Amino acid sequence: PLFLEASTGLNDDLNGVERKVTFDIRDSGIEAQVVQSLAKWKRQALKDYGFRVGKGLYCDMNAIRRDEELDNLHSVYVDQWDWEKVIREEDRTEAYLKNVVRSIVSAVCATEMNLHAMFPQLQDLPLHTPNVTFITTQELEDKYPDLTPKERENAIVKENGTTFLMKIGAPLRSGKPHDGRAPDYDDLS
């Protein structure tokens, strides 16, 4: 969806401080909000459409984030591909998460290889490897204590290539979080 009824509570609070773009729909008197993220909406859709364990959905979200900190990677307008799948309670583990990440990276690498084979003009571009470095934000801060969180991310990727950063919103020993997270659904464990 491009917008949601405000009363559903399905629009993402992101870090809990970003203001939503809100407007009224004249003929219905409903207050609506332009989506900031589909995180909660995806989970509700999985339930509403009866997705089974191991199955999921993907979506192409177009959002407006009026309070986004703008830079060369971030804009007020967001076009984001995302996915969500149903898992069992006992699969809510770090090991399961890492296996899912590895399977996604493997699929991306296989797609990249196929594109290289199909389009000779891509031959000069390097291929990514399916190796993933997993690191928590605390481990990252310990490794690069004098860098900002964003500089740490850049440094670890330069050093290791494909990197999966874990526990992004958890408090660090320095007393500063690596980055903000939605207070009402992000799971830091």
Regions flagged by a language model, labelled:
Residues 1-189:
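Structured aminoacyl-transfer and RNA-binding surfaces used for tRNA recognition/handling
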